[in-house]
Amino acid sequence: QRQMCIRDRPYFIDSTNFYDGYWQTSKYFKPFREELLEIFSPSDIILKKVFDWRKSIDSSNTVAVHIRRGDYLNNINRNSLKGGNVIGDVDYYLSAIKIIKEKVKNPLFCFFSDDITWCKDTFSNKLDNSLFVENTGSDAALVDLFSISFCEHGIMSPSTFSWWGNWLRKDKNGSIVVAPKGEYSNEYFLEKSWLII
């Protein structure tokens, strides 16, 4: 793959080749979605941790809000996001939340982030129907990834982690996913059903 988030022409594949690239478009593997969902199923340990936080809530309208900050906070990574930057852009997230509220009855906004303290400080006084999920331990990223996929709806940050969490959602019927406009919002990276704002 020559350019990130853009699908190249298909090449002949044989077992002696090694392929290197970002592969950040489902156009490469959409025909194998069911197979991939089976391959990328969480282990029993991860699944238990996902359900541990979910069983404490009484909502079938969970919305995963993924906010990536971490490495995007330094100027080099922040400036590499061409055509838009939503890192820490509270307005983007509030707009996405407003859209979800208009379309989903009684949504519960479940925040996942590598900076959950910032999320609490920023959003806890703006929403009364929110949950800040703090997974810890060496498997926290996997628990977050599958937790995002088990939520009924999603609000993405511009990251492949966010993309995979939403793409791995098994039941997509009626699922609403909001994604930010920018470098990643091209016809290859985002699914056609996702809302771009």
Where are each of the predicted segments found?
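Short, conserved active-site loop motifs that form the nucleotide-linked donor/cofactor pocket
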Residues: 2, 129-131, 194
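Short aromatic-enriched loop/helix-cap "lid" or pocket-rim segments at secondary-structure transitions
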Residues: 76-79, 123, 189-191
